[in-house]
Amino acid sequence: MVFATINRSATKTVPATIPAIEEAFAAEPSLKKRVYDAIENTPQYVPLFEDIARYTSSLLARPTNPPAQPAEASEGPAAKKRKLQNGTAAANAQSPADVKAETSLQFYMQDVSFAMPQRKKLTLEITAGRGFLRARNQTSKEVEFGVPMDRIRHVLCLPVPEKAQRQFNFCVIPQYSDGINPPTEGEEVFESMVWTISDGPAKAAFSGTGQQIGNKEGETAESLVRRILNENLSHIKVVRPDEREFVSAMPEAHRKGEKAYHVKAFRGSKEGYLFFLSTGVFFGFKKPLVFFAFENIVSISYTSVLQRTFNLNIAVRSHNGAEDETQEFELSMIDQADYAGIDAYIKKHGLQDASLAEARRAKRYNINGAKAEEDTTNNAEGAAAEEESELQKAQRELEDQEDEDEEDYDPGSDGESEGSGSSSEDDDEDDEDDEEDDDNEGDEDLVAAELGSEAEDVPQDEL
């Protein structure tokens, strides 16, 4: 027993103080002592206690929203009142200077390829105390850009289309950066972020203390980053494509046998990809990104329906926009092969019906696209099933027109016209000549009947 105790004491390498624990429990010395006592008895759980401490620090650092107070009557002009309110909001908002402040980290990953807002390799960081997601220059060690975690509205993890090697794009969309909702006056706007993670194990991912993580069996870099983000996003979750929502009729071009979740489309002359997700429709990956959240969509309709392609017209309204203030986005040159899947997605969420827009705005789909209430979904599906979609009508009319053209089509005779059939004008002239001949024959018969036997003495050409 004595030898075991001495041996255990000799192998201890726990530092006297741990920064994450010191920061988290600075105001609770008795609790901090209990944590250190537990670490002394079970040193193998140091990483666990550090994670708990960092999470506690992040909770303490998050600003608490005070309960809404009734607005007081103001004798001043309404414009002046709005200006004062906006100034207060801007003062309470976190600034870019806060994003770049030096603070302890919870997680960082080196050599991450960013595509937005800058195209370069940077270190991805998540801070412990202040709750920021940010990117640091690996040469200068300066923070290039970032966003407070509580200002993030959507995080998407999407497979990169048309790549031989499997990769994932993480798209972080802060408040007012979705391409639809403009910022209020004086509000700080943080840029959207896009970075790429290759499929496979994480090679340079670390905890805040510098311990390498992500090397567990079966854990990939994508699943690690997604897990870390979900642990730090209290109000939303990372959204991935789901074949129950939409899957393309065409498989991945460069990875045979793998399902594709994107649809190629154009916005103006800019080519991009559409993803139909559980929380909305995303168009990327080039600036500017656009995310059509369900609560912003008024309706979706089809335009420019052709044999091989069609367009989607998405009407949206911003959160602070008036009821009649809508803007439209046209996504063009979508392959007809994906019509059925897109149409099913639109009907499932009732996006073809503008009368359901207010219900979508009121609901806001709790936990970033958790299940909608079944009654609303079933009603939307039932209403959609009774209606023939605009695209189906257009397709039916196009087919009817083609059938009529085929019935009227005359391939012509193999005469001396260099192999071409007769035109419709020639057909009309031939019909007129035939009618004139019939009329003349009828007149001759009538004259002969009137003259009777005397007609024999009349020359044939005078009848």
Swiss-Prot record:
Residues 85-95 have a biased composition (Polar residues). It comes from the Eukaryota. Its main location: nucleus. InterPro entries: PH-like_dom_sf, RTT106/SPT16-like_middle_dom, RTT106/SSRP1_HistChap/FACT. Residues 60-97, 368-463 are annotated as: Disordered. Transmembrane segments: none annotated. GO terms for cellular component: chromosome; nucleus. One of its GO terms (molecular function) is histone binding. Keywords: Chaperone, Chromosome, DNA-binding, Nucleus, Transcription, Transcription regulation. It is found in: Nucleus; Chromosome. Interacts with histones H3 and H4. Histones H3 and H4 chaperone involved in the nucleosome formation and heterochromatin silencing. Required for the deposition of H3K56ac-carrying H3-H4 complex onto newly-replicated DNA. Plays a role in the transcriptional regulation of the cell-cycle dependent histone genes by creating a repressive structure at the core histone gene promoter. Belongs to the RTT106 family. This is Histone chaperone rtt106. It comes from Aspergillus clavatus (strain ATCC 1007 / CBS 513.65 / DSM 816 / NCTC 3887 / NRRL 1 / QM 1276 / 107). The gene is rtt106.
